[in-house]
Amino acid sequence: DEDIYKLNRGGHDPYKVYAAYHKAVNSKGAPTVILALTTKGYGTGSREADNTTHQVKKLSIENIKSFRDRFDIPVSDSEIEELPYVRPPEDSPEIQYLKKTRKALGGFIPRRRTTSEALKLPDNSIFEKLYESSGDRKISTTMAIVRIITELLKDKELGERIVPIVPDEARTFGMEALFRQVGIYSSAGQKYEPEDADKVMWYKESKDGVMLEEGITEAGAFSAWTALATAYSNYDFPMIPFYLFYSMFGFQRVHDLSWAAGDAQAKGFLIGATSGRTTLNGEGLQHQDGHSHILSSTIPNCLSYDPAYAYEVAVIIKDGIQKMYVEQENYFYYITTINENYKHPEMPKGAEEGIIKGMHKIKTSDKPSVRLIGSGAILNESLKASEILKKYNIESEVWSVTSFNLLRKDGMEVERQNQLNPLNKKKLTYVEECFEESIPTIAATDYMRSYAEQIRPYISGQYITLGTDGYGRSDSRETLRDFFEVDADSITRAAVFALFQEKYLSKDEIEKIYKELKVDSAKPNPWEV
């Protein structure tokens, strides 16, 4: 038994390991796998090959001495209880070999560059085009983001840095023009004739293609995004990846990878391109996203936005490039866009700061009795509700909330500063600065109510949140918004109720309005059916 024990297992025999590695390095034409037989807890004395090794928190002194003796570590018995670090001298063969080898491989790892080459902001005309009204033309915010990506790819300074990535749905997002413009990357080139070869925008693959079309693999597509998003640190060559996906199939499926990307200080854009629980309708409940912004809020350096208009998308993308690639701040952006087409207004003067901070006013009133706030597609329902309220002589103001998550972060920061400096003048949160008047506030989004609930501590008056809690239905947008009670009538109902609570409306008035709105008091909770 003693003689057999002295026979090294392959994974512990330097000669065998070297021989296997040498053969692997010199094998051509196929990858090589080395199977190495080893012993769990190798070198730890009595703990060697012990099934409970994983539960051991620390080794006994005797086991440590066995480890020292086995590997000839120069530590005396008088020192060993202190568990000193042992480092070979600089001129030792071990250190010299390590340094020489790492130099040949390009440097030491792990190594993180915190800064890299600073990029220049692209020509402002790329973004200014979307600051204008769409006129009578109805477009979606997904179309707006694709337009920006297309223009960025043409930019002389940044074009080579831009990489669009999709897991499968390029045509769904209206990105087929990029097939011809930049091509789809394939290491082998085009190996087949695509079904649409006779079309103008055919499925063109090439070795020098730029777009990554990864097939139905969100994990693979996100991994490609992470590799590009960390290129600034790994290769000192910042890239600007745009990964577009169904928003339900983003954090829901690859949240662990998203967290890892945040931990690695990734920089880039994630685009949830068909977002909203009522907006991507008819494809089954598993497609209808009502919580991706809640998931994104768990990642500290993820800045998430839910814009309603093309000009908001443009301002956010411009700010992202400025923060991540010019100022070199460690963030990545999650932006939800929608596939619903509607008319987009011109950007209000001076709206940029509010868009970036998380909220800006889009409809004013001299004497508002109620405040309506919304995001994404549901903002249009808030605007419709404002018009309905006007019929009942109720004035309202409307705000576009681009990010409840950022409003919450601002609130937490201000609260903390006030706690740390109790003798200083109390600072106000951005929400408090915007909402000076204490009037009822009605929030409506295409996400769970907890998304809008985040800013409740910073609102002085009544605050009612409407959202899309529950699984929902596979139906039309109009029906779904009525089902979840985030449509214009439901927002109006909430506003009227709040005003009744404030004694602004009488019993007769609220009964009349409820009747005209066809309020069904027996309707079941949307999140329970």
Locate predicted features:
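Thiamine diphosphate
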Residues: 1-82, 85-345, 352-354, 405, ...
